């Protein structure tokens, strides 16, 4: 399942032979990273944005097709107002300082979540990024903003119920495939909607309402590395761990 590259006859270096097509990332640990440096939490969020740029470029180079990043959850509104305001301004800075390079590297930017609740400047920055990169054919960087997995499924069920009432579909038409077409990830190619691998940084061992439908059969990788310290080498290690596993999808 994985190969070896001989670096100098004496040393064998394991390299991945299978790259996950879709990687989900729960970018956790920005606040703790800042605290360790006696800096405010927002300092960590800024460093986390720089890490995202580096990891996206590395993933694109490795041949990953989609990265979905958990940028802001529906529960994160309970954080201090100043921190929320800072986070909501990061997409503006991201568009100004990072999107041009990603665009030059053929990266396509998209967003999922209840985006109608986002502040105007946040929504406009991401919409501009989507418009600028819409014809790119490389890696898709999928921002989950104001996203919650349960809310996503609830909204899908409401839409399906309305379509049943409007006689657009029959109850017997409701299948897993149909539900999949009502989720936020419906804009992705069908074979790329479900993450092959979900990474969570910072040592926390939970998924926190991230892609519960799409991640049903995802391989999970937890690392103690705080998100701002997660780099290309850390990404490669996660992919190596993925390579060592046998995905059964309920079989043997």
Provide a role label for each language-model segment.
Residues 1-252:
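Flexible, compositionally biased loop and terminal segments
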């Amino acid at each position: 399942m994985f190969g070896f590259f001989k670096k100098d006859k004496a040393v064998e270096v394991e390299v991945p032979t299978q790259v996950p097509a879709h990687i989900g990332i729960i970018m956790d640990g920005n606040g703790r990273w800042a605290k360790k440096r006696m800096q405010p939490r927002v300092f960590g969020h800024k460093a986390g944005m720089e890490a995202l740029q580096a990891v996206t470029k590395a993933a694109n180079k490795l041949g990953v097709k989609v990265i979905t990043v958990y940028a802001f959850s529906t529960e994160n509104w309970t954080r201090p107002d100043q921190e929320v305001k800072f986070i909501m301004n990061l997409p503006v800075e991201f568009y100004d300082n990072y999107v041009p390079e990603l665009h030059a590297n053929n990266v396509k930017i998209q967003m999922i979540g209840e985006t109608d609740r986002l502040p105007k400047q946040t929504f406009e920055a991401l919409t501009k990024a989507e418009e600028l990169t819409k014809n790119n054919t490389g890696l898709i960087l999928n921002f989950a903003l104001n996203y919650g997995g349960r809310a996503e499924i609830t909204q899908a069920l409401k839409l399906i119920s309305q379509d049943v009432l409007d006689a657009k579909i029959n109850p017997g038409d409701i299948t897993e495939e149909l539900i999949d077409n009502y989720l936020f990830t419906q804009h992705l190619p069908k074979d790329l909607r479900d993450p092959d691998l979900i990474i969570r940084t910072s040592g926390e061992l939970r998924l926190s309402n991230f892609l519960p439908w799409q991640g049903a059969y995802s391989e999970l990788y937890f690392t103690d590395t705080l998100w701002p310290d997660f780099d290309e080498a850390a990404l490669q290690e996660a992919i190596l761990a993925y390579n060592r596993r046998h995905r059964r999808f309920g079989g043997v």
